[in-house]
A protein has these predicted regions:
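Rhodanese-like catalytic fold shared by cysteine-dependent sulfurtransferases
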Residues: 1-24, 29-34, 42-75, 81-121
């Protein structure tokens, strides 16, 4: 079921000209200093998130240009549980002048499926 959702999500992202990244690709981007934004509610973020990720709700993304303006030239990656909010967040950030924005393909579910670690801090 997850695989089917990931395929549908990926097709939608591509048809809209949006970029996504696999969990392994995200690790490379994180090692290069990417800004990672967790779109989930604060309670879910506190229960476990990607190391170094910053919690920012999808509502806050609408005005992220002000909050994150010093990061506009950095690579930014967004994620939620399933990847369903990633496309909208990528579009919002791109509209605000962010030039390298990606969504985590399959969201945190894909990260967990690859048995990758989470932080709880």
């Amino acid at each position: 079921m997850l695989a089917a959702l990931v395929v549908v999500y990926e097709m939608r992202m591509r048809s809209e000209g949006l970029q996504s990244v696999s969990p392994q690709g995200l690790i490379r981007l994180m090692n290069q200093g990417a800004l990672v934004l967790d779109l989930r509610p604060a309670e879910q973020y506190q229960a476990g998130h990607l190391n170094g990720a910053r919690q920012m709700s999808s509502e806050q993304i609408v005005s992220a240009g002000d909050t994150l303006k010093k990061h506009k030239e950095k690579t930014v990656v967004v994620y939620d549980d399933s990847g369903s909010l990633g496309g909208a967040a990528v579009r919002q950030l791109a509209a605000q002048g962010f030039t390298r924005v990606f969504a985590l393909r399959g969201g945190l579910a894909a990260w967990r499926a690859d048995n990758l670690p989470l932080s709880r801090a």
